[in-house]
Amino acid sequence: MARSGAKFINYMNKGAIVIDNGTGMIKAGFAGDDAPKACFPNVIGKPKYDAIQVGNNKEIYIGDDALDKKGILSLEYPLEHGIVNNWDHMQRVWKHTFDNELAVEPEDYPVLMTEAPMNPKENREKMVQFFFEDLQVPSFYVFTQAVLALYGSGKTTGLVVDSGDGVTHIVVVYEAYCINHAINRVDLAGRDLTSYLQKLLTECNVYLNTTSDFETVRKIKEKVCYLALDFDEESKNLKEKKIEYQLPDNSVIQIGDQAIRCPELLFNPSLEGKDIKGIHECIVDSIKKADIDLRKELYQNILLSGGTSMFEGIQERLNKEISGKAPPNTQIRIIAPVERKYSVWIGGSVMATLATFQTSWITAEEYQEEGENVVHRKCF
C-alpha cells in the first residue's frame, strides 16, 4: 500500500489535474484554478510524404503544432462524436498534455477526466488502464461532462445542452446524476457546421474546400455566424447588407445569409438532408422523458455548455422554439454563462477540490486489486 495514508494526503494537498477531453479541443489545468492552463486542438498530424522534411523532422505533430503545418500534414482526430476511435493517437495526446502543455509528471497528480454521456464501457476501461499502467497516476476519476457543466454553474439539477465540436448531448441531471433514459445524443455540432459553411461559401464564389482550409472556415464561422430570431426576415436583411471578412491572404470576401444559414442547421438539420431532430425538439423530448414532477424545474434550468453554444442569438432563439413546443404557460429559462465554452472544465476544477469528493477517487491500490472494472463501481 505504497501510496496510502500520509502520502496520499500529500497528493491531495498538491491538487489534481483536470482534463476535459473534447472532440475538438483538450482543456487541461489544475484543480482550483478559474480557467484551464492549456487549451489546444485534439488533433494529430503526420507528414503526407516520407521525403518531406518538416522542421526537426518529427514523425507526429500534436495540437496547434499540427494545425500550423496542416498544408503538409495529414490531420487525424482521435475522437469522433465524443468517443475515442483511435487509442494510439488519443494516448499520444494525453502524454503530450502532461509533457508539453502542463510540464508536470503524471505520477505526481491525481487526474480528473471527463467523458461523453453513455461512453462505451470498454472505452472507460481502456482509459483507466492507460492512466494507471502507462502514466502511473496515483488516483483517477472520470466524470460525465454534462454533470460537471451543471455543477460549474452552481446547480445539481437541470437540463444541459452540451454542444462542442463533435457531438451535441441533451442531458437531464437530477441531484448530480444523469438520467440515462432521457439523454438525447445529436451527431451534429461544431465540426458539422464548419463543413456546412464550406459548402455555403461556394455560393459566394469562395472555395475553401481543402483540409488545410478547414481551420480558416472555422474562424469565419466563429466570427461571422449568428442565429436569427426570425430566419426569413434576417435573410432578407443580409441579402441587402452583406458582411465583410478578411481572409489570411488579406483578400476580403462578402458573406450574405450564409451567416445565419450555417447555425440554422442546429434547428433544421434537414437543410443538409439530415433526418434528425433539431436541438429544440430534442430538449423538449428529453424533458418529456423525465419524471412529470421534475419537468417544470427542467424547463426553468436549461443550461448551455460548449463552444457551439456560443453563437450570438442562441438564447433567444431557443426560448422561442421551446415555447412553441412546451405545454401552455410554461416558464422557460435558458442559462448561458459567459464562460460556457469552459463550463465542463470549471465544474471539474471545483469538484476536484471539494473535501467531500476526496474519498471518491479511484486509487492505484484499488485499481491493482480490482482491475479496470473499478471504474464502473466508483464512477457512475
Predicted feature locations:
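C-terminal region/appendage detector
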Residues: 1-380
